From Swiss-Prot:
Gene3D superfamilies: 30s Ribosomal Protein S19, Chain A. This is Small ribosomal subunit protein uS19. The lineage of its organism: Bacteria, Pseudomonadati, Pseudomonadota, Alphaproteobacteria, Hyphomicrobiales. Belongs to the universal ribosomal protein uS19 family. GO terms for biological process: ribosomal small subunit assembly; translation.
């Protein structure tokens, strides 16, 4: 189920403050964040965010196509190593 339109997109408050601070300073740095649940807004386009995936901050460069999605969609949390190989075939 999607979020109600009348509520608007969810953004953590500290994230907006961090973006404003970087915009004022004019620096082009990675903005570290832990809020995977926040929605990407049009004002975030052009910035690079370090989205935490449980181990490290994955750099995510925001472009126009990402607006409306959540930050967590672009930083996978699980690593797939493939299914177990056949041990008999491996031994030969």
């Amino acid at each position: 189920m999607t979020r109600s339109i009348w509520k608007g997109p969810f953004i953590d408050g500290y994230l907006l403050k961090k973006v404003d601070k970087v915009r004022e300073g004019g620096r082009n740095e990675v903005i570290k964040m832990w809020s995977r649940r926040s929605t990407i807004l049009p004002q975030f386009v052009g910035f690079t965010f370090g989205v935490y995936n449980g181990q490290k901050h994955v750099p995510v460069s925001v472009n126009e196509d990402m607006v409306g999605h959540k930050f967590g969609e672009f930083a996978p949390t699980r690593t797939y190593y493939g299914h177990g190989a056949d041990k008999k075939a491996k031994r030969k």
